[in-house]
Amino acid sequence: MSATLPAARPAYRPQAAGVTAGRPADRVPTDGMPVTMVPVMTRPTTLGELRLAGWESVPVAEELRRNAVARIRSGEPMFPTVLGYEDTVIPQLENALLAGHDVIFLGERGQAKTRLIRSLTGLLDEWMPIVAGSEINDDPYGPVSRYARDLVAEMGDDTELGWVHRDDRYGEKLATPDTSIADLIGEVDPIRVAEGRYLSDELTLHYGLVPRTNRGLFCINELPDLSERIQVGLLNVLEERDIQIRGHRIRLPLDVVMFASANPEDYTNRGRIITPLKDRFGSQIRTHYPLDPDVEMDIVEQEATIPVVDGLSVVVPEFMSRVVVAISHEARRSPHLNQRSGVSVRMSIANQEALAASAVRRAVRSGETVAVPRVSDLDALAASMAGKVEIDSIDDDRDGEILDRIVRAALLGVFREVVPGELHRGVVEAFEEHDGVSVGEAVGSGAYAEVAAGIPALTTAVTVLLGDESDGGDPPAALVASAVELVLEGLHLSKRLNKETTGRGSRYRIRA
């Protein structure tokens, strides 16, 4: 490993009280810690220079605690990209970090467990010195591997250093049934033995993922899927903080904070976490889906990838995003779905993307320059929803009917929320003197705008529904079309209008 790093990386942060170093001027601080701009060239390259710089070695748990306290004290959000946990999960995680605990996150799929864990690297110091060439990030002040011990003993203060960025101090393993002790802890390297080394030589060891994350954070995802005999191999890591490899008479002390994630159903369906291992995790934190639809809308806006097409503007009105989120919340309440499996936020994200894609396809085909999702585009959600829910139904033919019922319930709920009830009667009465309105993929946005202009009550409802969407001016015809469809479909679901579906479109009429 090289003793120097590219100048684009920020300088190290000494730990001694009153001694600070910082990042280059083109790097914006992200951890809320006070920094002083110091040239990258001042970073020590030898053990002797490191001692003179006043750097102090601290355990990883203490490093997390210190930086978490600084983040809390500064008032910055601990995990700015994780939304909806500010009053529930994050306070528990902050307590666990301050207590120096290993943590297991328990929750259904799509609850940001892995994202939370990966975000913890932001609480590590930007740079960490190691003995150059070490496979397990040996501390220059207290090396533990045979290689690093011998090197420091031979070179003393002239021992060369390497610097590891915080992002490289995180290790992760997805637990699978074929995961072995060699993968996690280590094994004797037969190639090194073939080169002439003795089996008793510690240098023949090939370290696994856990020791290679020494002085860092290690996460095991889907922990119950790890076979029980392999889970036993982690007991020493969590309690005694050491590992033993094969028949070698070594106990390699490690400085690593362990994290794990698991789904609640895994305890009974696919596997279990052995009791001694659960007992060794200091904190167990239960995650959850967003409790507030507005928070889930923010998550969808943050995560969804909306298609970008030259010459086409894509606008997703707030009421359609609200319908997308309402579908997920309705699904989480449905007795026809397996709630133990959960309804992931990923479904909301995928539905938003599918809805926007359907609008883009329609706009490109019709030659329009603005693409806005409509209620009729919700048919595209069948594909994005199908793999993200588990339906508890003996009759597979009812799957489509159940999902359609969920979508209709979500639509009706949003309609009642965003369109005031006093506006409903005026639109219905106007339809008594109107032949009806046709909607669908083949109907251009201009036709909807003409319909709205010809029915004053509908124009009023559309204006109220769009609110700030029009930015104070006349809204685009595509936006009006989306609002018209929501109003008409809402009145139909409220049993105020009839809907006749034929081919690629539908027609709304007054109820007989």
Regions found by a protein language model. Name each.
Residues L124-G162, D167-L209, N214-L312, A354-S366:
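Canonical AAA+ ATPase core
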Residues L116, L120:
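Hydrophobic positions on the alpha1 helix immediately C-terminal to the Walker A/P-loop
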Residues G54-P59, A70-V89:
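Dynamic helix-loop-helix/coil hinge segments at AAA+ ATPase domain boundaries and subdomain interfaces
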Residues G54-R66, T268-R272, K278-S341, A363-G367, ...:
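Conserved C-terminal "switch" segment of AAA+ ATPases
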Residues R340, V360-A512:
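C-terminal engagement/docking regions of AAA+ P-loop ATPases
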Residues Y85-E86, E94-G100, E108-R109, V210-T213, ...:
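Phosphate-binding P-loop
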